[in-house]
Design a protein with these regions (language model features):
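A structural microfeature
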Residues: 1, 47-50
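NUDIX/MutT-family hydrolases
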Residues: 67, 76-107
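Generic C-terminal helix-cap and adjacent flexible tail
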Residues: 108-113
Length: 113
């Protein structure tokens, strides 16, 4: 998980790595590009985990979450304030962006199985 920078909307809240899909890109291609731009890593994109939509007062965002593995590199803080590797049981220790809450709920449900 990554902590948003102080100078952006939803400052210092935690989120999953990602960003906008550019014209002509698939969602997996966008994720590969965003991981390279935000963390300087190359990932292999696996199965889609879930999709969700959330409306903030200023923007509506559509999130698609994929499982990924790092193929190359060590994550670096290029755009975020902080970075953490956590287990599902630690999710509640962090303040996430509201848009991520349905994803967190699903992760915790999956972890109970």
């Amino acid at each position: 998980i990554c902590q948003r920078p102080k100078n952006k909307a939803r400052a210092l809240l935690w989120e999953f790595v990602g960003g906008k899909v550019e014209p002509g890109e698939t969602k997996p291609q966008a994720l590969i590009r965003e991981c390279r731009e935000e963390l300087a890593i190359t990932v292999s994109v696996g199965e889609q985990f879930m999709e969700t939509t959330y409306s903030y007062p200023d923007i509506t965002i559509h999130l698609t979450l994929f499982s990924c593995t790092i193929k190359e590199g060590t994550p670096k803080l290029l755009e975020h304030n902080d970075l953490r590797w956590i287990t599902p049981d630690k999710i509640t220790d962090f303040s996430f962006c509201p848009a991520d809450r349905p994803i967190l709920k699903r992760i915790m449900e999956e972890n109970k199985k």
